[in-house]
Curated annotation (Swiss-Prot):
It holds the Pfam family Ribosomal_S8. The gene is rpsH. GO terms for biological process: translation. The keyword Ribonucleoprotein applies. This is Small ribosomal subunit protein uS8. The lineage of its organism: Bacteria, Bacillati, Actinomycetota, Actinomycetes, Mycobacteriales. It comes from Nocardia farcinica (strain IFM 10152).
Amino acid sequence: MTMTDPIADFLTRLRNANSAYHDQVKAPHSKLKANIAEILKREGYIADYRTEDAQVGKTLVVDLKYGPSRERSLAGVRRVSKPGLRVYAKSTNLPKVLGGLGVAIISTSQGLLTDKQAAKQGVGGEVLAYVW
């Protein structure tokens, strides 16, 4: 069976592994998922990520991050634009997640950017996910 929304699958794997206090999560690799992981690492939601060569294809391994007393650094993830309903935002109308405490991941013509980076560069695009 084919996967209709690989980004939602990746975000769900992150959410479930984080809720179960796993140290790492594995997902099928793609450039888009690696870019999402790079944004999450840069914003401090995950510890690290790497690509491993498997027998069939590549695997993206994400090391999750927790606080000193095992509190989650990734409180929530929500997929916004879906294959059945795409959501776009102009550069003047970019979404704020929890009043600026969270991050919106936006696919732009300059690549994947956070809402703050997109506003600074003056570009809009497809709103992929909210992370807080």
